[in-house]
Design a protein with these regions (language model features):
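Short acidic, gly/pro-rich beta-turn/loop elements at beta-sheet edges
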Residues: 24-26, 59, 82-84, 150, ...
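Glycine-rich acetyl-CoA-binding "A-motif" of GNAT/NAT acetyltransferases
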Residues: 55, 68, 116
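Intrinsically disordered, low-complexity proline/glycine-rich segments
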Residues: 57, 183-185
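Core segments of cupin and vicinal oxygen chelate
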Residues: 6-54, 88, 96-104, 108, ...
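Vicinal oxygen chelate
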Residues: 1-7, 10-19, 48-50, 62-85, 87-138, 163-180, ...
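Active-site-flanking structural segment that lines cofactor/substrate pockets
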Residues: 55-61
Length: 204
């Protein structure tokens, strides 16, 4: 499905931060058939992954030590206003709002359960231009041990509704925006290693 815009409050982009960018680009291009387009030295090695000339994800050098991590971006009308909303709702601002050339404006946050995510205020780059097809983003899912905190936070910041989904399991929640399903939440039980923090997972 081709996309030309995203409604505010909708997950719209993902990127991978990795300590081995060359290895990651080789792996994902072989797995998904991505064409990797280096954005130039001014972008610090950041690359766009494309299918048929349409951007579907980003890959860049990790900005923090540790294992590779995928970041989910949520479209907003104003990244600066999102900073205030996140603070008010009890989240933590990891990176204040800043411009990405003429592509858009972003900020990075941690929710009260410890999951990191970003917001995206689009200008020339709307986010993923192709979704719900092989090799592209199909789903974003919050994985957390504190679902009640997460429900309160995301409903306040983005206006999401949290709806239990018994068909997907007793601990599964669908996030909806204006009655449209835009993501999910699963509760981490004791089967999850204790060292794994709350995080946003991405599905292709």
């Amino acid at each position: 499905m081709e996309k030309t815009s995203y409604a505010p409050g909708t997950p719209s982009w993902i990127d991978l931060g990795t300590p081995d960018l060359a290895g990651a680009t080789a792996f994902y291009s072989a797995l998904f058939g991505w064409e990797i387009v280096d954005q130039g030295p001014e972008a610090g090695g950041y690359c766009m992954a494309e299918i048929g000339g349409k951007p579907v994800a980003g890959l860049g050098n990790a900005q923090q030590p540790g294992p590779p991590y995928w970041t989910t971006y949520i479209t907003v009308e104003s990244a600066d206003a999102a900073v205030d909303k996140v603070k008010s709702a009890g989240g933590q601002v990891l990176v204040e709002a800043f411009d990405i050339f003429d592509s858009g404006r972003m900020a990075v946050f941690m929710d009260p359960t410890g999951a990191v995510f970003s917001v995206w205020q689009p200008v020339k780059h709307i986010g993923a231009a192709l979704v719900n097809e092989p090799g592209t983003l199909i789903w974003n899912e919050l994985t957390t041990r504190e679902p009640d905190k997460a429900r309160a936070f995301y409903t306040e910041v983005f206006g999401w509704a949290a709806e239990d989904d018994p068909a997907a399991g007793p601990t599964y929640t669908q996030w909806t925006l204006d009655s449209e399903s835009i993501g999910g939440m699963i509760v981490m039980d004791d089967k999850w290693p204790s060292e794994v923090p709350s995080h946003w997972m991405v599905y292709f």
